[in-house]
Structures are given as C-alpha cells and as structure tokens.
A protein has these predicted regions:
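Acidic, Mg2+-coordinating phosphoryl-transfer loop and its flanking beta/alpha structural elements
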Residues: 168-206
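Metal-dependent phosphoesterase signature
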Residues: 56-99
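Active-site neighborhood of HAD-like aspartate-dependent phosphohydrolases
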Residues: 1-43, 49, 55-57
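Non-catalytic pre-domain segments flanking phosphatase-related domains
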Residues: 1-6, 62, 219, 224-238
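Conserved Lys-Pro-Asp/Glu-containing loop-to-beta segment of HAD-superfamily phosphomonoesterases
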Residues: 145, 149-177
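Substrate-recognition element of Asp-dependent hydrolases with the DxDx(T/V) motif
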Residues: 93-124, 136-142
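Helix-loop "lid/cap" segments that line or gate small-molecule binding pockets
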Residues: 48-62, 151-154
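A short, structured active-site edge motif that brings together acidic residues
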Residues: 38-39, 43, 67-68, 129-142
Length: 238
C-alpha cells in the first residue's frame, strides 16, 4: 500500500491570503490590538505557532488560553473570509486526487499545520474535502514533527507502512523535516513560499516547480498509471 501525507496551504491550494483577514479580525476582537499577519513569513508555521508569534509581536503574555481563543475565533471567521480573495486549487492537484480516489493501492491523509476546523473550512471552500476522510492536525501542538508522528500512527492503524512507499507532499522546509522525522520520502513542490533552490537545499527526495501531472505523479510514487491499468484489464478480458 502506498501512503501519501498531504500538506494544505501552498501544496493543495492557495487562499491568496484570504485567511489573513480571519486572523487579523480575530486578533482585533480578542485583544483589541491591530495586527497584520502579512508581516510574518507564515509558510510552514502551524496555527498555534502563528498564535504564539502574534502574541510575542504584540507584547502580550503568551498563554495557552489566549492562543486557544485566537485560533478558535479564527476558525469561526475563516469561512466568511476566504471568499474575500480569489484563491484556487494549485496546478494538477485536483486531477491527481481524482486519479487516486477510487484506487485500492493508495491512501491519502492530511498532515497539516492547520487545526481541523481551519483545514475543513479551506478544503470545503475549494471543493477538496471529499478527497480526505481523515488526517493529523495542529489541534494542541505547535510542532509539525508531532503532527507527522500522529499521521504515521494513523496510517499504521490501517496496516504496515513501508518507508519507500510513504511520501510527504509539501511546499516548505518544515515539510521536509517532518518526512525525515518519520523516515519517509518528501515530494517538495515550489508552489508555496519557497523556491525550488530553497527547497533543494534541505535535501528532499524529489523537488518540482509544481505537482507533476497525473501519470508522472503516479509513476513517481510507484503506482501504475491509469492508462496502464486500463490496458492490463483489456488484455485480461481478451
């Protein structure tokens, strides 16, 4: 069985910074302070890392309770904030997910720094929610490596996971670190906040400008392309 662990922002989709409205409004409501999330380089940061950094920059006492309130209000505001910018699903993503959907030799999990609520809002808005029945989220941790360990444990509940048949797909050095932490391969894509050169410096297994087209992606992760499977079925029926 091939196992794929997918990041969201910059890998599956871009909100075109639509989520920043929700964060800035949440900070204003809860702290009374003005804040612009665009002042941070957030690719690769978890929602709770963003909360902690926000408090630090505003000179507020960092507390789990305040971080929790910020994140929960952000989740509530996110569905109405996303339409304020024209985000989109990134190249080849929908086609690849469609090609994987009905296969029995591969399973996809989310492995994301979003909380479950944030991930659900984004995937629902961009029409990708049905491709991901489950995953590991940043519910109570700031560390991506912890999320990766949880994602791997989730996959192992369904059966053995071979290192050479398991892949993290992501767009930041943090995703590469996560893959290394759990001993699987990284497919890095430069569709987020980092260039191919920046990603390559962290030694991913493979790096691309964007997610490869369907057949190339399937071959990359060791799966026969749909065309080959169709030919095999025709030969068998003949």
């Amino acid at each position: 069985m091939t196992v794929l662990f997918w990041d969201i922002d910059g890998t599956l989709l871009t909100t075109a910074k639509g989520g920043m409205f929700a964060w800035d409004d949440a900070v204003k409501e809860i702290t009374g302070r003005d804040f612009q999330l665009q002042t941070l380089r957030i690719p690769g940061m978890t929602d709770y890392q963003i909360a902690a950094k926000t408090c630090e920059l505003l000179g507020l006492e960092r507390s789990e309770e305040l971080a929790h309130r910020l994140v929960r209000r952000y989740e509530e505001l996110l569905p109405s904030s996303l339409p304020r910018r024209t985000g989109h699903v990134l190249p080849n993503v929908r086609e690849v997910l469609e090609a994987l959907r009905d296969r029995t030799d591969v399973v996809s999990y989310l492995r994301t720094g979003n909380t479950r609520g944030g991930a659900t809002a984004k995937l629902t808005h961009y029409g990708l929610i049905d491709f991901f029945p489950t995953g590991a989220f940043a519910e109570d941790t700031k560390e991506r490596a912890t999320i990766a360990v949880r994602a791997l444990a989730l996959a192992r509940e369904a059966g053995p996971v071979a290192e050479d048949h398991a892949f993290v797909i992501g767009d930041t050095p943090h995703d590469i670190e996560c893959a290394n932490a759990i001993g699987v391969r990284t497919i890095a894509v430069a569709t987020g906040g980092y260039s191919v050169e920046e990603l390559r410096a962290h030694h991913p297994w493979r790096v691309f400008e964007a997610l490869p087209p369907v057949d190339e992606f399937l071959r990359l992760v060791g799966l026969p392309p749909a065309s080959a499977r169709a030919s095999a079925r025709q030969a068998h029926s003949a």
